[in-house]
Amino acid sequence: MSNEILGLKPEKMWKYFHEITQVPRPSKKEEKIRKYLVDFGEKFNLETIVDDIGNVLIRKPATAGYENRKTVVLQSHMDMVCEKNSDTKFNFDTDAIQTKVEGEWLKAEGTTLGADDGIGIAAAMAILDDTEIEHPAIEALFTMDEETGLTGAFGLSKDLLKGSILLNLDSEDEGEVFIGCAGGRDTIIELDYSTEELKSTCKTFRIDVAGLNGGHSGDEIQKGLANANKLLNRILWQADKDFGLGLSSFDGGNLRNAIPREAFAVVVVAPEDEQKLKDLVSKFEKIFKNEYHETETRLFVKIEAAEANTKIDSESFTKLTNSLYSCPHGVIAWSQDIDNFVETSTNLASVKFKGGKIIITTSQRSSEASALDNICNMVTANFNSVGAHVKHSDGYPGWAPNPNSEILEVARESYIELFKKEPKVLAIHAGLECGLIGEKYPEMDMISFGPTIKGAHSPDERILIDTATMFWDYLIDILKRTPLK
């Protein structure tokens, strides 16, 4: 354990967080973190269950005097988003996250930190380990594959949980208590293409759009962050219009729920157009820096010589650039009921060349079911217009707020007493597992809260250390106040 983490308070929560960072846990590859949690539960002689889908449930009896309180589910997810800077050598399947303290923040060296949702796991483990904290019966539920499919929540059985209160430990703004979330649906678009051999006289170059912040496509979509796929495509579209361009490859974005922060293309031009292309790239770098001078201070665009033997056919290239240009991205509608709350959005998440097809991924979110259908239809119409095949996932439900929640009132009273101010009670424009869990357990009383985490789903992910202490104090105080059965 690094000396920096060793000195953080509360020690037990940070101890477990450090251990978690040493265990590889990509989405859909939770074997190692699952074993770690099972070994932990068995070490403390706690009832430990692995369900059919791969979720882990650890039960701890109530402390003396709390046997007549309602059982509480502490819910977090095992997997983490695996993103790294292009110049960082790191294998998420085998390597341990390297953490560092920078001022008031804890972050990682060139990769995502995994505080989403490692800090939730660590808090639950610290409570399961502790012998002095007063609490009702606890069910610590650690779900699998939240980040790429909500698979654990989808596969959760309707008879596993005994608790009637659920505390979701997967929110990212201290002082905010969430009582609702958006539903969502992902989209896979496939566009066929053929290849053509390049003439020996052609010039080939790689164009990079990078240095963007990226971030969570739900929680940060309203910040006006740039989308690397959209920026790169603007260059390609304009170059083809001005002097003609060929495309050998396009690689932008990786995750459905992350705003793309890097995109790369290998392009082909006639020798006489080489300088025109370089000038255009330089021009667009200035344009982008001006357009995003407040939100993307590290943005850069560069061009360098590259090698390629083929390009895609010109018709497919035109279809691709036209459809990417017109594809909606960002906030589509704001809530008419909640001030400054995004109702509907979409994220142009990734563009890849794979197996002779161009694979484009988008992710739509909305707190209104009809609006979610509408934005999905917009994406479908856009790509159908160029002959692409479009397939939507089944999606996941939203979580309808319950302003009369008993645990919400407990949480409000606790926050006021601890911190001498009111918490903000909100809904979030992101998919929380509460929506799916609430479908299976309709009587479950749920809230979500957590410490302040910035830059989630990007290598800039960081956790504000003091708020983690506040999160811990808040969590254990809520447990002490749990309502009677």
Model segments located where?
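Acidic-enriched catalytic cores of C-N bond-cleaving enzymes acting on peptides and small amides
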Residues: G180, E197-C202, I221-D251, P271-S345, ...
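Active-site-adjacent substrate-binding region
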Residues: E220, N227-F250, P401-M444
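His/Asp/Glu-rich mid-to-C-terminal helical/loop segments that flank catalytic regions of hydrolases
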Residues: K158, G224-D242, P271-E274, T318-Y325, ...
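Active-site metal-coordination/substrate-binding segment of hydrolases
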Residues: Y66-A137, F142-S164, D186, T201-T204, ...
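Zn-dependent metallopeptidase/amidohydrolase metal-coordination segment
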Residues: I5, M13-W14, Q336, E343-S345, ...
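Fold-level recognition of mixed alpha/beta catalytic cores in primary-metabolism enzymes, strongest
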Residues: P136-A228, D240
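Acidic/His- and Gly-rich active-site-bordering loop/insert found
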Residues: N3-W105
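A short beta-alpha structural unit
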Residues: H18-Q22, A265-V266, F300-K311, A349, ...
